[in-house]
Structures are given as C-alpha cells and as structure tokens.
Amino acid sequence: KTCENLADTY
C-alpha cells in the first residue's frame, strides 16, 4: 500500500 511497503515487496 505504501511506497515503503512496495519497495519491500519488490
């Protein structure tokens, strides 16, 4: 959901 979350997923 958050940019940080996306970075963690990618």
Curated annotation (Swiss-Prot):
Residue pairs linked by disulfide bridges in the UniProt entry: none
Residue stretches spanning the membrane: none
Keywords of this entry: Antibiotic, Antimicrobial, Antiviral protein, Fungicide, Mitogen, Plant defense
GO biological process entries: defense response to fungus; defense response to Gram-negative bacterium; defense response to Gram-positive bacterium; killing of cells of another organism; positive regulation of cell cycle; positive regulation of cell division; regulation of defense response to virus; response to virus
Keyword Phosphoprotein included in the entry's annotation: no
Similarity comment text for this entry: Belongs to the DEFL family.
Function: Has antifungal activity against F.oxysporum, B.cinera and M.arachidicola with IC(50) values of 1.4 uM, 2.5 uM and 0.15 uM, respectively. Has antibacterial activity against the Gram-positive bacteria B.megaterium, B.subtilis and M.phlei, and the Gram-negative bacterium P.vulgaris. No antibacterial activity against the Gram-positive bacteria B.cereus and S.aureus, or the Gram-negative bacteria E.coli, E.aerogenes, P.aeruginosa and P.fluorescens. Has mitogenic activity towards murine splenocytes. Inhibits the proliferation of M1 leukemia and MCF-7 breast cancer cells in vitro.
Protein name, per record: Defensin-like protein
Organism: Vigna unguiculata subsp. sesquipedalis (Yard-Long bean)
